[in-house]
Design a protein with these regions (language model features):
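Ferredoxin-like iron-sulfur electron-transfer modules
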Residues: 1-34, 38, 50-53, 57
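Long, compositionally biased charged/polar accessory segments in the mid-to-C-terminal portions
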Residues: 37, 41-196
Length: 196
């Protein structure tokens, strides 16, 4: 809940239902992320929906970014899984927090999740590029392989990076955007004070 100082009433978050349902005027009829997700300056949040089986368990949806991070790559974990709280909020555990504390917060899978996140494979690195590229909910992604752009070591382990393209699709099945792994480099001309 949030305290509204003008009305002097505590107001509960409604989860931005008009946005999530696609009835927000800005949405064009397509589901959008909540305002708090869209306003996240750290580009560390992703909101989405998953397909469910009749018994309420997650249906396999291999190319849904949430399903991939939670059930395939297993880098996104529930916070305090022993409580079984709802709704399902999943987090990629931070790698700089002491592991004993992370094990308490995320359970026994945290060590493998942190290792996988620190040394991402080709697909995980591509899926991580989807974060905060759009305020619309991503329902599916596609990976188009590109050339190798880096080969070396990362924290003492061999690492290869490819300039793959990841394509995001919305609820209507249409392409929302595409982005590459390797970010372009721009050099400002000397006429600007802060040029290099």
């Amino acid at each position: 809940t949030m305290f509204n100082v003008e009305t002097r009433i505590s107001e509960k978050c409604i989860g931005c239902y008009p946005r999530v349902e696609g009835s927000d005027p800005e949405s064009g009829g397509l589901p959008m992320e909540t305002r708090c997700m869209a306003a996240c300056i750290g580009q560390v949040r992703m909101q989405g929906t998953v397909k469910l089986n009749e018994d309420g368990t997650w249906a396999e949806d291999r190319y849904n970014p949430l399903y991939y991070m939670i059930h395939v790559a297993k880098v996104a974990l529930p916070l305090y899984p022993q409580f079984g709280t709802e709704p399902n909020g999943y987090y990629i555990p931070p790698r700089w927090v002491p592991r004993a504390y992370l094990r308490q917060m995320f359970g026994p899978g945290v060590d493998a999740a942190v290792e996988k996140y620190m040394y991402p494979d080709r697909e995980l690195l591509a899926v991580l590029q989807l974060f905060r590229r759009s305020n619309r909910i991503i329902y599916r992604y596609e990976l188009k392989e590109g050339p190798k752009v880096y080969e070396g070591t990362l924290r003492g382990k061999p690492f290869e990076m490819y300039n793959d393209t990841v394509i995001a699709y919305g609820a209507d099945g249409k392409e929302m955007f595409r982005t590459e792994i390797e970010e372009p480099l721009f050099v400002r001309p000397d006429i600007h004070q802060n040029s290099i």
